[in-house]
From Swiss-Prot:
Protein family according to the UniProt entry: Belongs to the ATPase A chain family.
PROSITE patterns documented for this protein: ATPASE_A (PS00449)
CC per GO annotation: chloroplast thylakoid membrane; plasma membrane; proton-transporting ATP synthase complex
Keywords (A to Z) from UniProt: ATP synthesis, CF(0), Chloroplast, Hydrogen ion transport, Ion transport, Membrane, Plastid, Thylakoid, Transmembrane, Transmembrane helix, Transport
Keyword flag Transmembrane: yes
Designated gene of the protein: atpI
Residue ranges crossing the lipid bilayer per the database entry: 38-58, 95-115, 134-154, 199-219, 220-240
Pfam families: ATP-synt_A (PF00119)
Species annotation: Ranunculus macranthus (Large buttercup)
Molecular function, one GO term: proton-transporting ATP synthase activity, rotational mechanism
Higher taxonomy: Eukaryota, Viridiplantae, Streptophyta, Embryophyta, Tracheophyta
Protein name: ATP synthase subunit a, chloroplastic
Described function: Key component of the proton channel; it plays a direct role in the translocation of protons across the membrane.
Subcellular location: Plastid, Chloroplast thylakoid membrane
Subunit structure: F-type ATPases have 2 components, CF(1) - the catalytic core - and CF(0) - the membrane proton channel. CF(1) has five subunits: alpha(3), beta(3), gamma(1), delta(1), epsilon(1). CF(0) has four main subunits: a, b, b' and c.
């Protein structure tokens, strides 16, 4: 069985995908490395929003919560419930990871739908949601893969690898490829949906009066939120699956 070469080729393919370019890009040279400036700018903006929100959320909490405090507590409770549902009773240590993934993707997606990035002129290319770039989605999917391997090894030790021959050793190649293709599916699903949503809005705005694309933009906001939920749910489900050892 050529299991190892297949797995290596899958990882190599994932690395090659991170170099895929859609449209023009504006680059910065940092320490001898060429990086996508658009992705860094919009990602830093999203991170600033999240950090600012976190500072506001933990500053001066009230015994009788304000509307803002109620909102942040609801978001935290939602993420905790999501993690507990997918991972089980040992969900606690994974809440920060799942929450970070969900919130970063959610705010990134909505920033692409709500913020007028395109009015900011760049020498090449244009600004868009961070998740509109395959490099970002791959960068989000790879830590998810590391997380579920880490969760399984921490819970079961080397016995974790026994799942690859369940229910029969004949399925060994398929079970191995399944784990190594999970980041591929996560990356392409998020990237494809966000890119398609932004392209549809751009085309409609260029073809019809400005009022007509508004319903499509609201639909884009809805699907953007759903994509963040799907990514976080699948990430938590993969972690829970690796700890329980079932498929």
């Amino acid at each position: 069985m050529n299991v190892l070469p297949c797995s290596v080729n899958t990882l190599k393919g994932l690395y090659d995908i991170s170099g895929v370019e859609v449209g023009q890009h504006f680059y910065w040279q940092i320490g001898g490395f060429q990086v996508h400036a658009q992705v860094l700018i919009t990602s830093w903006f999203v991170i600033a929003i999240l950090l600012g929100s976190a500072i506001i959320a933990v500053r001066n909490p009230q015994t009788i919560p304000t509307d803002g405090q109620n909102f942040f507590e609801y978001v935290l409770e939602f993420i905790r419930d999501l993690s507990k549902t997918q991972i089980g009773e040992e969900y606690g240590p994974w809440v920060p990871f799942i929450g970070t993934m969900f919130l970063f993707i959610f705010v990134s997606n909505w920033s692409g739908a709500l913020l007028p990035w395109k009015i900011i002129q760049l020498p090449h290319g244009e600004l868009a949601a961070p998740t509109n770039d395959i490099n970002t989605t791959v960068a989000l999917a790879l830590p998810t893969s590391v997380a579920y391997f880490y969760a399984g090894l921490t819970k079961k030790g080397l016995g974790y690898f026994g799942k690859y021959i369940q229910p029969t050793p004949i399925l060994l190649p398929i079970n191995i490829l399944e784990d190594f293709t999970k980041p591929l599916s996560l990356s392409f699903r998020l990237f494809g949906n966000i890119l398609a949503d932004e392209l549809v809005v751009v085309v409609l705005v260029s073809l019809v009066p400005s009022v007509v694309p508004i319903p499509v933009m609201f639909l884009g906001l809805f699907t953007s939120g759903i994509q963040a939920l799907i990514f976080a749910t699948l990430a938590a489900a993969y972690i829970g699956e690796s700890m329980e050892g079932h498929h």
